[in-house]
């Protein structure tokens, strides 16, 4: 990904002015560039800009720095992806103004893919790290490793993902941020400051962030712990750390029509009158599971991701009801399946084997 190296002293001198250039999304102050094209190439800095109005279709005058050429770390573009305005604008502000952005919300709503698809359209390298309970401080910071040099085994320190990303033009995404271990979270706390330096005590090194380094996170909660019972393993987050996140946006379940449009964008075989009717009924079933969950009648909730999988599985099996049972119903508690089957019956007018009527008859 790196096209070349620039002397540390020169990089240090230019850091502040170049950071400002990236934040403004311009080539430099009036009267000349902060850096010429060769310098920008050496540091892997954005070399173009995109209009939010033209690229994403939202009414906004924001202009975001971007790269003209993608590299191997840029996510693949999904041309059918539908963006949520609030979430997308928050993410774009993170890229344009070096804000630390957290996207919270229920599972399956597209939190991580929103960040990836924004990065894909900016050609901005993006790396995701699943911050589960097994990710340790060593995994993030680095460790000593035995390597072979000149035919001899020697011990050499290898940077973890955090120092590596911190020194490159990478958008680092911490998935499942609220499931991270406390010792790991305190390592991250220092880099939450936009110009904070990362100190590696084992190496007596102080790392300055690359001007194009960006940090994002996704979480099912907002640091207050799991109040729904859906997300076992999540933890409360130190409020001093939460305070360092510049922007926190929520991406929860969308209105019916928007969710149906997302499903149709993915399940193209339903793009006809009959198919649209089926998708609307699928989303209606999902809406009923969410209402039942809110009312305390159901412990499992249907996410937009599940609806998309249901539509895809229905094409595989050629049967909407059978696909529903395999995609969602079998994930539910056995005692709650008659309730979920009733939701299906209300929407589609068909009884499933798990419906209350069939259970009573049997």
Model-flagged regions — what are they?
Residues 253-255, 260-325:
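Conserved AAA+ ATPase small/helical "lid" subdomain
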Residues 89-97, 308-313, 325-330:
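Short, hydrophobic/amphipathic alpha-helical patches that form generic packing surfaces
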Residues 317-362:
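C-terminal engagement/docking regions of AAA+ P-loop ATPases
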Residues 3, 21-25, 31-276, 284:
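AAA+ P-loop NTPase catalytic core and its hallmark functional loops
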């Amino acid at each position: 990904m790196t096209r070349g190296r620039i002397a540390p002293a020169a990089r240090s001198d230019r850091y502040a002015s170049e950071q400002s250039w990236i934040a403004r999304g311009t080539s430099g102050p009036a009267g000349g560039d902060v850096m010429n094209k060769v310098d920008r190439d050496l540091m892997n800095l954005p070399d173009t800009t995109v209009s939010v109005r033209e690229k994403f279709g939202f009414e906004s005058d924001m202009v975001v720095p971007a790269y003209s050429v993608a590299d191997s770390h840029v996510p693949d573009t999904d041309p059918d992806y539908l963006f949520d305005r609030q979430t997308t604008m928050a993410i774009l502000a993170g890229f344009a103004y070096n804000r630390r952005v957290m996207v919270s919300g229920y599972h399956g709503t597209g939190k991580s893919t929103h960040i990836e698809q924004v990065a894909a359209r900016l050609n901005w390298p993006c790396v995701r790290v699943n911050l589960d309970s097994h990710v340790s401080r060593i995994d993030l910071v680095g460790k000593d490793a035995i390597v072979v040099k000149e035919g001899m085994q020697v011990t050499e320190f290898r940077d973890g993902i955090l120092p590596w990303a911190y020194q490159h033009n990478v958008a680092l995404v911490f998935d499942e941020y609220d499931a991270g271990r406390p010792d790991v979270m305190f390592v991250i706390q220092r880099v939450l400051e936009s110009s904070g330096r990362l100190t590696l005590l084992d190496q007596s090194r102080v790392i300055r962030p690359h001007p194009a380094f960006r940090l994002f996170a996704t979480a099912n909660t907002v640091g207050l712990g799991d109040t729904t019972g859906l997300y076992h393993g999540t933890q409360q987050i130190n409020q001093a750390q939460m305070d360092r996140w510049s922007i926190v946006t929520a991406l929860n379940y969308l209105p019916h029509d928007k969710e149906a449009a997302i499903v149709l964008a993915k399940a193209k075989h339903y793009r006809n009158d009959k198919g649209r009717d089926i998708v609307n009924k699928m989303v209606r079933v999902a809406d009923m599971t969410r209402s039942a969950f809110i009312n305390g009648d159901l412990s499992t909730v249907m996410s937009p991701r599940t609806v998309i999988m249901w539509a895809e599985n229905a094409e595989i099996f050629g049967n909407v009801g059978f696909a529903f049972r395999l995609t969602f119903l079998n994930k539910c508690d056995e005692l709650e399946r008659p309730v979920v089957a009733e939701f299906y019956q209300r929407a589609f007018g068909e009884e499933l084997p798990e419906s209350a009527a069939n259970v009573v008859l049997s």
